[in-house]
Amino acid sequence: MFDNSTQVVGLMGYPLGHSMSPAMHNRAYKDLGINYVYLPLEIKPDFLKEGIEGLRAFNFRGVNVTIPYKEKVIPYLDEIDRLAGEIGAVNTIVNNGGKLKGYNTDALGFKKMLEDDCSFEIKGTKAVIIGAGGASRAVGAVLAREGASEIFLLNRTLKKAAKLVGIWNKTYPGIKTVALPLDEDKYLPVVKRCDVIIDTTPVGMAPGIKGGPVIAKEAITRDTLVVDLVYNPPETTLIKAGRQVGARTMNGFPMLIYQAAYAFKLWTGIKPELFIKPVREAISPDFFA
């Protein structure tokens, strides 16, 4: 039952048809007995500024931000957290009395997933990131902060990848970062010698599932950890390709839960562990690839 004291949070993006966040958050709020509700807020690009202003006008407690707005929301916020500023992308906004502050819990969620669900130690490893959007910024920051020796960024638009690599080279001067085109002849010898491949693109996401994996199966070895941040469907074409060669695989569902749990703490002040437990228990194990 909603009343005047109900705290409203939500997910801001476009489109939102694939998202499980509302069901996940509302399940946790119900189980924990807190007076919150989580709403999908599909906002077309021409109305992003008005959408942000609406958070103040309607006194929302905050929102998560997803594709395509993680970078675009920043100019409309009053303040951003240090990590979010370093990454250059925001996925969580907190409204404190009309003052909007941006955070990035994607980075925290990704780090926890690698450590807890993949048992993967980043330090000294060679990593491949596919895609140069907001999620790749968070992933790259985690890898660099935790001491990866080399990071290769693959993107269809090489110019966009090169721009992000330029930022990383300045922010993390001790880490070798290289931009490569999604051209099999160029990336194949590099990717085959890497320890982890992380796909941050929406390729293979429901409902628009089509085509093969974003990189050639020949680039994956049985010693590679293959991570696809897409979680619906649980087995993307990239995950399937990884399994076919005997590689370890992980989809993005644990990261989704963890980043949500950290956002939950920012909004409610409640420990993220209390969010994680009921959500994990309610989710089919099929989601954990």
From Swiss-Prot:
Q: Name one GO biological process term.
A: aromatic amino acid family biosynthetic process
Which residues are recorded as binding shikimate? 19-21, 66, 91, 106, 231
Can you tell me which residues form the catalytic site?
Answer: 70 (proton acceptor)
| CDD domains in the cross-refs | NAD_bind_Shikimate_DH (cd01065)
Q: Which InterPro entries match?
A: Aminoacid_DH-like_N_sf (IPR046346), NAD(P)-bd_dom_sf (IPR036291), SDH_C (IPR041121), Shikimate_DH (IPR011342), Shikimate_DH-bd_N (IPR013708), Shikimate_DH_fam (IPR022893), Shikm_DH/Glu-tRNA_Rdtase (IPR006151)
- What catalytic reaction does the record list? shikimate + NADP(+) = 3-dehydroshikimate + NADPH + H(+)
What Pfam families has UniProt attached to this entry? Answer: SDH_C (PF18317), Shikimate_DH (PF01488), Shikimate_dh_N (PF08501)
Documented EC number(s)? 1.1.1.25
Q: Which GO terms describe its molecular function?
A: NADP binding; shikimate 3-dehydrogenase (NADP+) activity
For this UniProt record, the keywords arranged alphabetically read as follows:
Amino-acid biosynthesis, Aromatic amino acid biosynthesis, NADP, Oxidoreductase
Question: Signal sequence: where?
Answer: none
| Pathway membership, UniProt | Metabolic intermediate biosynthesis; chorismate biosynthesis; chorismate from D-erythrose 4-phosphate and phosphoenolpyruvate: step 4/7
Residue numbers binding NADP(+) = 131-135, 155-160, 229, 252
Top EC class of this enzyme? oxidoreductase
User: Among its keywords, does the record have Disulfide bond?
Assistant: no
The UniProt entry, under NCBIfam families, shows: aroE, PRK00258.3-3
Record family assignment: Belongs to the shikimate dehydrogenase family.
Q: What task does this protein carry out? A: Involved in the biosynthesis of the chorismate, which leads to the biosynthesis of aromatic amino acids. Catalyzes the reversible NADPH linked reduction of 3-dehydroshikimate (DHSA) to yield shikimate (SA).
| Alphabetized PANTHER family for the sequence | BIFUNCTIONAL 3-DEHYDROQUINATE DEHYDRATASE_SHIKIMATE DEHYDROGENASE, CHLOROPLASTIC, SHIKIMATE DEHYDROGENASE
Q: How does it assemble?
A: Homodimer.
**What's this protein's name?**
Shikimate dehydrogenase (NADP(+))
Its source organism is Halothermothrix orenii (strain H 168 / OCM 544 / DSM 9562)
In the UniProt record, the gene name given for this protein reads aroE
